[in-house]
Amino acid sequence: MARRTLGAAAIALAALAPLGATGAFAQDKGRIYYLVPTLLDEFQTESVNVITDSFRQVGYETVSLDAQNRTDLQLNQFDDVIRLKPKAIVLAAVDFDSVVPGIQKARDAGIPVLVFDRQITSTPVDFTSVAGTVQIGEIAAEQIQGLLQARHGSVKGKVLQILGDPGDSYTLDIQKGFEAKMKAFPDVRIITQAALQWEATNAGNIASDQLLTNPDIDLIFVHAAHLAVPVAGILEAKGKKPGDVMLVSSNGAPVGLDLIRKGWEQVEVEQPLYAQAVALAMFIDKIVAKEKLAPGTYDVLGLKAELTEEKWGPNLKIPGAAITKANVDDPRFWGNLKPPSTPVQPVK
């Protein structure tokens, strides 16, 4: 009977197709599953690495599962993982509404759910570690205002805003912050389109079509650096030189930093990936022990993060920063792929 049980567990694990683990039984506090929405961009792949290492430092093994941008697959992963009774589930949702039943099932089974990056506010969770996404949009707006001012002598012109997938709260919050800050400048016309599923080819097609119908676009604002790559390619194919049509992005990935160095992109507003990941490990022991988290300011890799108690649960918001040609090589930006060497300090 013991042999059959072990075999069934092994089959279940194989069916889950883990992307990365620190090694079976390598840690003494148990296993955590990280449900990744996709591995199509460097933010997601680097998040797997840093989350795995951060949890390892505090005694947990991590297994990461790729949902391949499919809500049905992510919900199936929830069902499979719940049966394995892990210490916790870390979730970066494909779609913030569709995944709610999975969250509720896990918590009903006594498994804490920690939300990483893609905020969910419609159902209770045990912890949320996010960038200040509305603030990212606000910072982008301030940077864009400066770029338009430098070009025209006043804040005016035409901006193409390319969202990610509209099912992702990350992009909707950036849009909210950006457009709220731009309302004070009625001479700026903003054209908004969404790159469904965060597909880079969709962003390229949007840019190509809009440059045909609106050849006087001054600036293109994309909500992730991997979307900026095809946009820069379209600009080059149309005979544009770096800076002819300005480009701003908002997550700080390596490809975005490279575009800054090459002159195609003027600003990246960084999403603080490393701090968001480390924060999960800082709080995990208290979450697993079902201890109350004290609201307040916490130092996360030198950033002042604010923990508040929201209707959906404890919410840690971490600030981003603008990256330009002047500071693009700063190692604190995750896009330079230099993970933090500072040991994780669990919250007591």
Task: Show where each model-derived region lies.
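Structural motif
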Residues: T62-K85, T192-T213, A228-P230
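Extracytoplasmic "Venus flytrap"
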Residues: R31-V58, T62-D80, L84, A92-F96, ...
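Hydrophobic alpha-helical
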Residues: V90-D108, F178, L196-L259
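Short, solvent-exposed amphipathic alpha-helices that sit
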Residues: F43-V58, I136-Q143, S169-V188, I206, ...
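Hydrophobic alpha-helical segments within soluble ligand-binding/sensing domains
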Residues: Q74, S129-K156, D173, N202-G204, ...
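Hinge/cleft segment of the Venus flytrap/periplasmic-binding protein
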Residues: D28-G30, I162-P166, K181-M182, F283-K348
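Short beta-strand elements in bilobed, periplasmic/extracellular small-molecule ligand-binding domains
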Residues: R56-A67, K158-Q161, E179-Q197
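Flexible loop/hinge segments that line or gate small-molecule binding clefts
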Residues: D97-Q135, G146, A150-K158, A253-R261, ...
